[in-house]
Amino acid sequence: ICPNAFSTVSVSGAATYIWSPSNTLSSSIGSSVTASPSTTTQYKVVGIDNNGCRDSSNFSISVYPLSVLNVAGTSVICEGDTSTLTVSGAINYVWSPSSSLNVSNNNIVDAFPIATETYTISGTDLNSCNSETTHTINVLPTPIISLSSSDDTLCIGSAVIFNAAGASQYSWQPSSTLNNNTGSTVSAMPNSTTIYTLTATDTNNCSVSQNITIQVNPLPILTISPNSIT
């Protein structure tokens, strides 16, 4: 039998019966008992007929070893990220809850929880015995940043200053018109209307990106016409 399962055993041929050991039996007497051993166990039943004569018989109930499920995969992710989980120890598996899982194989899933989630994995082995384990994925929030600019409309040749806060590392793109593409404060001198992207990363290595558009207007074209001299 499988671990944590039971087997019903019946006997006939006598009037009364005594079973031992009784600690894993539903009863120590009767013609039918339920056995639920945790390990392979040998039992003995003694039958007594109406004349008081006795006979005994031994039997064994084998208990399959419990399959141990092992789950490998990331236990901490950032909000919006995915963790690939792999389980071993059985042949067929059921994962739950399944709403935040993509099952690529019976033993491999991609988990994308929006908040910390504990998954339960049930496995069935070659003996059709079931075992269970859990795996928790902790979801860290992405940083909440603020992004501002000294102006959103420039004339060609003018500069704009960007200020960011709420993270520990900053990366700005495109970098070609920036005085520095890292740091919380940078300046830019774009030659045309440009969309700048800030990627901010916190101490947990979680990142978020935000765009800001700077419109660049051309300079006026001056035409000088001298007065005619007479």
Predicted segments with their positions:
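Short, exposed coil/turn segments at beta-strand boundaries within extracellular/luminal domains
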Residues: 2, 27, 50-56, 78, ...
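Solvent-exposed loop segments of extracellular immunoglobulin-like
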Residues: 13-23, 89-97, 166-174
